[in-house]
Amino acid sequence: MIVKNKLHKDVLAWEIEVEDLNIDVKNLDYKLQDGSLFKKITTRFENHNQDLKNKILNKLDIDYIKKQIPEYKEIDIKIFKDIPGFKLWPHLDRKDHKGFIVINLIDNKDSTEFLDFDEKFLAKSSNKKNKGVFHILWKKPYCLHAIENTSNKNRYTTIAFIK
């Protein structure tokens, strides 16, 4: 994982890039996400293949994560398919999440947006394959983030939730 530019002076988020994961996302088995992270959302599906999750985890720069979030205990990898119409409104993540890394598994139309507490746009992460964002949560300056799939195609990402 290569950490690049900070997205905005008021957002603790940096563009990242990883080697090609070579995951055939369109042919994976997905199940409707179970609601443990996102209640009442019926437009996000999850793949539970542990070998793929380990492959993704091995591409992350754990030393860099430890340096930025020394109190972290674990990294929970999720592989998502967001169908057209998927939307997470501007929000803060759960308190047990210290940060996250989103990686696009294909070129997606939409990507994570960061907003202030008046929901004014601040920055947007990359939507390109093998690129994404590393965001530190619960440290100042605080901000909201949101995502929506406005395309007519599925959006494929992996998210490493740093706890």
Locate the predicted segments by residue.
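Non-heme Fe(II) oxygenase catalytic core, chiefly the N-lobe of the double-stranded beta-helix
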Residues: D63-G99, I103-F117
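Non-heme Fe(II)/2-oxoglutarate
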Residues: M1-E71
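Exposed regions on extracellular, virion, or secretory-pathway luminal proteins
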Residues: L21, P70-K73, K140, S151-K153
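N-terminal start-of-chain detector that recognizes signal peptides
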Residues: L52-K53, Y72-K78, K129-F134
